[in-house]
């Protein structure tokens, strides 16, 4: 009971006072006592003094304690016997009490009687308690004296109401009250209760608190109910006593209903209660809840606990950090500390409640889970989730799930989490290990928003917690990094990067943990290695102290070891680490406000360290072209992203970049001579050079020298004594040169602009007729030459894409045309050069690992696929080819260039084959910078051709043509997919190279998604221009060809390119607006800007338009394009684009109608035909669009009935190659897609219909009955289609979804029929009769599957038959329930095939008879089963689910 009252402030003070009095009154020594006894003994002849002396107590005067010469029990017994045996008993009692009253008139004497007595016995002889009771307490233990003593005390108490504490700081009223506590027996409890309540009513407030909180120790259990009622009345009258009264009520044995009333009274006052009173009140509320009302109480408590009770005032928040660091505070700091103490105490109360009451913790989680609005979520909610997660291990999974759902839905955002940590860090730091455990769990997710939340938990734990917790955070992050999981490693490194910036001094203390990651470099990617070395270098060179010097030494050791390795993978680690470290060492600190000019500038010693490190890297990599190219790329990245000190930049310009001209640039007038396999020519020059000043890139001779060096074996560079320069380094070296010049000259590239228009020493690249006569080595040489030329041009475009003069723009556009032309030429070579491996374009581990698989693995896949296809063609199958689903073309598994034959079989159209082969080679092309897409702004560009004297000789108009536009859009689309698509949507297959999806995006990966989105938003206007131009192109094309866009007069190649541009633009728009980052508040402005661009295409509006208006206008703008959509795939992207935009709107009903209407238009449109043998519409795309239509249409059942009842009969009555006139997309080839989607959506729809109850209104019953009639009618129409379309995939769909529909009928419809039968007898019987025919057909389908012995169909038969049998039983039960068994006839069925012919097989007859024997019929198509049977069936159905799905994929 005492433990429950820890929160009572008054009691704590009392105990402290008592302890103080005990200490003060302890005897100093026995010698001292004896010396003062003679002078201090009370000399009084009163009966009171005499009887006490006889019984063993000697009263003392002054400051001395009364002395107890005997044991306490012996004294009470002796005095009791003396009083009882006294001749004048019971009058002696009055005399004794009168003597006591006279004695205690003196204040010192009264005080001595209230304080404990001094023991005169030896401690060894004492068998009683170590603490002696006071005289008054001893007298209260004697029954015959107790009533009179209590009366005396209550009469004496008012004298001290308004007196301050005496000189000894002793509170007399509190001492008086304490005498009544823990009495062995209360003689008259009712009288005592009355006296106490009367005293409370007149006592001052501080004494009221003391008396009320002492009640449980004073009163017996029998008085609890009366006291409780009195206190509840007092609670209403005097709100200032709320805390002590509730504290006491929690400790009394009271009726639950009474406590409920009190609790409701308190809940109503909750919003007006002071913070310091809140812990006691919350304790009472939580202790008074029952299992039935817990959720209701907790939900109300959540709402009424305003933030002001749990969050410090704003003026206190600002000083918290100061409090943490200084450790001392002023008077205001004491107030802050008090407020924090109250909050900590509050959460201690809640922790205690949820630890011992499972219902409270579960109700609290449920209350938070039920909160839907973002604004309703509070800091208090997050703290509670953390507390329950750390306190109750059984609810961890539940909380984890709730938290993930809240994060996904955007209800819990970063700002809320930050507020939680900044305000309640003292509460949360005790749960550090649990919070880190939760963060670790969240980082294992595939959802980026959940991963980000987990990383924020680590970040804020490090920021707000103490040193020990910071160490735990770093240790946990290091564990993630060493795990090898790519997403975890990326996230953990990003957090470390933030922590290094956030609190470098704290991170320095934990640097030894980060340094340990150097032992696990094998498992992390190049981009992750960059981050790791950036963290370590920042720690090593931020401050010059002993710890940082140790890190420097270790890093130097690791880097030298890796650089000296002969394995390229380890050399790569050394190069990346060294360049990253050099960047930190040579960083430009001139703008740092904390450094003086002398310290900011790089010293000569530091500059020497940087240059020696870079020279070491250069010397260790120069023997390997790949290593050199990687070094140049890494150095270029460093210059691009980091601001280097001018001294370091100057050294780069003088040492490395000046070597470029010697290595790759020659005079254009001097044609190289040598034994080259092809004649060397200067090609692709943009200027005519008449003088000797012209330059050219010496590409073909360098490539030939490299190939010759390979073939010549050891006798390569040793004989010539010259350093071989690999053409592989051309593009990386130029990138380094360009960025260095750009940084030194503030973006001016005049020094190197000659490289933009200079020619290249090549040979005639157009193969013509000589292609077939070339040797394999010559074709490989030509392929490599074109790859290197393309990479050179791509870097040239990267360099000069942002030039503003028309001449330079024209030249860049010309180079872009050259890239497109060369890709077409390259395609011709690749098609006849099997197993060719291109030269690397990106130099990292991921690329090297995947290179061997690029050709051989895919070639093997094609060969295997070809064998399978040939086998399928030779197999005699009854499945009609028109109903067989074609698989979606998968870009991950595209065949290699070497297999031209297979390509021609699988794909039609030159563009498809070209894009396919180039896609395989994507990893070997240099990456285009995001700035390149500024070219999309170009319309018509006038280029001036100058003569030798710089006079205008002619003008040429250059424009961005469709091929160049498509080239740029494809690259931009791939970049957006890589950066903005959530990882869960692009999950790589099991055991696939983990970095394969990032190949060719290493520069892009160094930017954040926000940066990419911002860059693309700058392109929205030009992309809208291109979209409108393409729209106009197709509109004009349709008008010229009388509405037929693929008529005979159409230029096929141009048409396909424009169509592809259309698709890519829609794809880019979709990827942009589908970005999950828009849900974060900091990105809302980006969304507004993008929508404003779209809406302004229709009309110029104000920038401050509301979101709904912007969404509506944007959708209206995009909807206008639907008439010119050239392909079904474009249509699907347009629909998806509109959907992601409308998701951000609140007008859901109108939005669904818009989507459904547009989807129906696309389904009812005649699309341009592809291959004559089959539709050009992908089955997956058709499936997606049809699902969108049915999910968004107002009535799914009517839509299904229209397709199945109108479209399909039109198809049946049309010629073989024709289609439905209402739905032209419905052909015999696509029928199975329509059938599967309609069956799946029908089953999904009926599962959502609530069964209803007998208590529902008549109108509701009729509406549901009508709905089920429509559903069964649709099901009947669909089922009967298998008589016409009996291909294997159709039958499979019918078996799978037929069973699911029957299950839904049993669960959702049969309860409705139970209580609708009597009122709507005819309707119910009609419904059952229709459904009986359908289930009869399902029974025939089971027989058909068995007789054909197709295992992929027969695996569905047992579960379907069981479901049908349950239906029979359930219909019988329904008829019995309504006393009308004769209303519906149930009988046995014969086994028949789909045409209704009886199956004569004896085995099937016997098995059917056996199966039908126990049930009334084998299946006569009825309703469904008992509830027990349902559960068994469901579990069986779940086991079967996976095999169904895997088979569907193969259909």
Swiss-Prot record:
Coiled coil: none annotated. Residues 8-22 have a biased composition (Basic and acidic residues). Residues 248-359 are annotated as: Interaction with BRCA2. It is found in: Nucleus. Its main location: nucleus. Disulfide bonds: none annotated. There is a cross-link at residue 561 (Glycyl lysine isopeptide (Lys-Gly) (interchain with G-Cter in ubiquitin)). The keyword Phosphoprotein applies. Residues 1-291 are annotated as: Interaction with FANCE. The keyword DNA damage applies. The modification Phosphoserine is found at residues 8, 222, 592, 594, 717, 1257, 1401, 1404, 1412, 1423, 1435. Residues 23-36 have a biased composition (Basic residues). Keywords: Cell cycle, Disease variant, DNA damage, DNA repair, Fanconi anemia, Isopeptide bond, Nucleus, Phosphoprotein, Ubl conjugation. The modification Phosphothreonine is found at residue 1426. Monoubiquitinated on Lys-561 during S phase and upon genotoxic stress by FANCL in complex with E2 ligases UBE2T or UBE2W (isoform 1 and isoform 2). Deubiquitinated by USP1 as cells enter G2/M, or once DNA repair is completed. Monoubiquitination requires the joint intervention of the FANC core complex, including FANCA, FANCB, FANCC, FANCE, FANCF, FANCG, and FANCM, and proteins involved in cell cycle checkpoints and DNA repair, including RPA1, ATR, CHEK1 and BRCA1, and is mediated by FANCL/PHF9. Monoubiquitination prevents DNA release from the FANCI-FANCD2 complex. The C-terminal 24 residues of isoform 2 are required for its function. Required for maintenance of chromosomal stability. Promotes accurate and efficient pairing of homologs during meiosis. Involved in the repair of DNA double-strand breaks, both by homologous recombination and single-strand annealing. The FANCI-FANCD2 complex binds and scans double-stranded DNA (dsDNA) for DNA damage; this complex stalls at DNA junctions between double-stranded DNA and single-stranded DNA. May participate in S phase and G2 phase checkpoint activation upon DNA damage. This is Fanconi anemia group D2 protein. It comes from Homo sapiens (Human).
